[in-house]
């Protein structure tokens, strides 16, 4: 078996094909505030929900929901840094149910609350 055949075999049997990764990411990122049922994204990729979830995790190292939450937090970080929008508005724009939900998830991923992160950024302290 050649190297290309081995790669194709791994993609077919373990993860998503490159076009499926691109399509899934594009669909999930189209509107971060929208609810993206995994079943619909899977259908666009021509897969069942369970197969899609397993293949997505193999391809990207994380389940689709967790990947989407991280993208939402990244977008919230950008909005916190680049706008003066309220944290509640940012939460809504990024697909969180409310400010409290954003704060819990943001703190779990970033290590500080959105308000503290914003204050520190504006004060010139950089938190990664």
Segments from the language model and where they lie:
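Hydrophobic recognition helices of helix-based DNA-binding modules
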Residues: 1-3, 56, 80
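An amphipathic alpha-helical interaction segment
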Residues: 1-26, 39-40, 44, 51
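Terminal helix-turn-helix DNA-binding modules in bacterial transcription factors
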Residues: 22-30, 34-40, 58-97, 119-128
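A short beta-strand-loop micro-motif that forms or neighbors metal/cofactor-
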Residues: 31, 45-47
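Core residues of bacterial helix-turn-helix
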Residues: 44-45, 94-95, 106
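Short coil turns linking two alpha-helices in DNA-binding domains
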Residues: 48-49, 97-98
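Short hydrophobic/aromatic patch on the recognition helix
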Residues: 52, 56, 101-102, 106
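…primarily DNA-binding HTH/wHTH and HhH modules…
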Residues: 104-128
């Amino acid at each position: 078996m050649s190297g290309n055949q081995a790669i194709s075999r791994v993609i077919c049997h373990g993860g998503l094909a490159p076009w499926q990764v691109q399509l899934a990411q594009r669909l999930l990122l189209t509107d971060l505030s929208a609810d993206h049922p995994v079943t619909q994204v899977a259908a666009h990729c021509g897969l069942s929900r369970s197969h899609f979830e397993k293949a997505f995790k193999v391809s990207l190292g994380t389940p689709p929901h967790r990947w989407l939450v991280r993208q939402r937090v990244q977008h919230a970080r950008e909005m916190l840094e680049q706008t003066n929008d309220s944290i509640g508005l940012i939460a809504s724009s990024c697909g969180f149910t409310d400010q409290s939900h954003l704060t819990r998830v943001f703190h779990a991923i970033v290590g500080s609350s959105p308000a503290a992160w914003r204050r520190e950024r504006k004060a010139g302290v950089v938190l990664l």
